[in-house]
Amino acid sequence: AKEKGGKLTAGLAAGGHWNPNKAPHHGFPWSDDAHLGDLPALTVLHDGTSTNPVLAPRLKKLDEIKGRSLMIHEGGDNHSDHPAPL
């Protein structure tokens, strides 16, 4: 957890999107002008499980993400800097 607005908030300690190339905004994982850490949608079943592979076409080596967190958000993702329900 990390503090925000005087309250401990779970997940904030993971940090922001991985953006080593200083891309200007969030976007689709296959877009060269998006954060390198932007990933595609993950489909999860009602019981909370998923067996779908997560494809990250711009990540080439596991060492690139070693020591990093993977954050999965509930709900849809419009691949925007201003998230909105789908």
From Swiss-Prot:
Top-level EC class as recorded in UniProt: oxidoreductase
Record has Lyase as a keyword: no
InterPro entries: SOD-like_Cu/Zn_dom_sf (IPR036423), SOD_Cu_Zn_dom (IPR001424)
Compartment(s): Periplasm
Keyword DNA-binding attached: no
EC number: 1.15.1.1
GO cellular component: periplasmic space
Disordered: annotated segments: 1-26
Cofactor binding annotation: Binds 1 copper ion per subunit.
Molecular functions per Gene Ontology: metal ion binding; superoxide dismutase activity
Keywords recorded for this protein, A-Z: Antioxidant, Copper, Metal-binding, Oxidoreductase, Periplasm, Zinc
Low complexity: bias regions: 7-16
Gene3D superfamilies in UniProt: Superoxide dismutase, copper/zinc binding domain
Cofactor: Cu cation; Zn(2+)
Main location: periplasm
Binding residue positions for Zn(2+): 17, 26, 35, 38
Catalyzed reactions: 2 superoxide + 2 H(+) = H2O2 + O2
Residues that coordinate or bind Cu cation: 17, 73
Family per similarity comment: Belongs to the Cu-Zn superoxide dismutase family.
Functional note: Destroys radicals which are normally produced within the cells and which are toxic to biological systems.
Oligomer status and interactors: Homodimer.
Protein name in the entry: Superoxide dismutase [Cu-Zn]
Species classification: Bacteria, Pseudomonadati, Pseudomonadota, Gammaproteobacteria, Pasteurellales
